[in-house]
Amino acid sequence: MKKDIHPKTFKATIRCHCGFEAQALSTKGELVQVEVCSNCHPFFTGKQRFLDTAGRIDRFRKKYANFEKKA
């Protein structure tokens, strides 16, 4: 077996922007910061955010309406 071919592992603290912290093994370093975790992600919390997709669809149709007329 070859020596020193495996990456070094650290006991890392994973920190979310919501303030949640967890401990895990990582090769990235001792502190890993994430934007979203299971504590604050809408899928896990049940708090869904609806985006204004109706306005986006209207803008898309208005922008590409001329292509439909020409074809």
From Swiss-Prot:
Species the sequence originates in: Solidesulfovibrio magneticus (strain ATCC 700980 / DSM 13731 / RS-1)
Gene3D superfamilies: Ribosomal protein L31
Residues that bind Zn(2+): C16, C18, C37, C40
Function statement: Binds the 23S rRNA.
GO cellular component terms, A-Z: ribonucleoprotein complex; ribosome
Lineage top rank: taxon: Bacteria
Protein name in UniProt: Large ribosomal subunit protein bL31
GO molecular function list: metal ion binding; rRNA binding; structural constituent of ribosome
SUPFAM superfamilies: L28p-like
GO term, biological process aspect, one: translation
Record text on cofactor binding: Binds 1 zinc ion per subunit.
Subunit structure, interactors included: Part of the 50S ribosomal subunit.
Swiss-Prot/TrEMBL cofactor(s): Zn(2+)
Family, per entry: Belongs to the bacterial ribosomal protein bL31 family. Type A subfamily.
